[in-house]
Amino acid sequence: MKRLISLIVCTLLMFSATGLAYNATNEVENISMDDDVPVWENGDSWRYNIAKLSFQLNQSGQQMSLDMSMTDLLIDVIGTTETSYKLAVSGNINGLFDYDDGAGTTIGGILFITRISSGEIKIRKADLAAENAYFVIKSIALVLEHPLAPIPLPIPLTITININQEIPRSLIDFPLYDGKEGIIPETNIDANIRVESFVLKILHSLIHDFPEEIYVEQNVTLPMLMYTATEEQVSVEAGNYTAYNIDFFEGILGSIYYAPAVGNYIKAVAEINTMDIMLDVKAQLKDTTYR
């Protein structure tokens, strides 16, 4: 469970400063020689779609998986100070989940009605590093596989996520230029996730295999990342852009695409597959108010 939470936290941070943009003329934007940190203003917003966000974990007999998509994930700049931005986050989530503890208990089902009801992220102006984040996710999970099978159980859930980055770091090493190479240093993240439901409390009183609530608190180490930034023409849902393909470990861990014309990412692709862990992310820009 802790390693699955680690993957979720890392993915949230990948998108924590992500914005997706709209180009009304669908024309290719040009990049200057060096592109520095963009300036955001109150009211700037970005919207994007995550076509795929999948996790699978096999460890010590336990098997866990989460297969999601997110539509209209909206990020708004709602506050600024001399040193930071305050972002609001909202969006809808669809997906499937499955858990097998390896000892005979299996729980699985559908995230039927799920949304990020509230979310805030603090971003450092100097480099767009995420300092901390807070999310509240409301869900009605239709549990299809459980100790009471074959009776489906609709369970309302409230999921609260807190993330603090010990030494904030950005996935973009500004200023950018074509052919730039470098290293993003490792850092630590303190994260806690709480899953609550009155139905879980009732079921726990009847069946001890059901947890009363789920709470995970963990310090996650994000490793050092070697990257290369290459200028490319990139086509996404919003249009065509000249962007930097920032790939990590020569693309082995995936890439993020940053377009100076929109002041943010326009695309993210990650696919990690080992014997124990699988992570698959595909996201792209939809629209923005940024100019």
Residue ranges with predicted function:
Residues 12-17:
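Hydrophobic core
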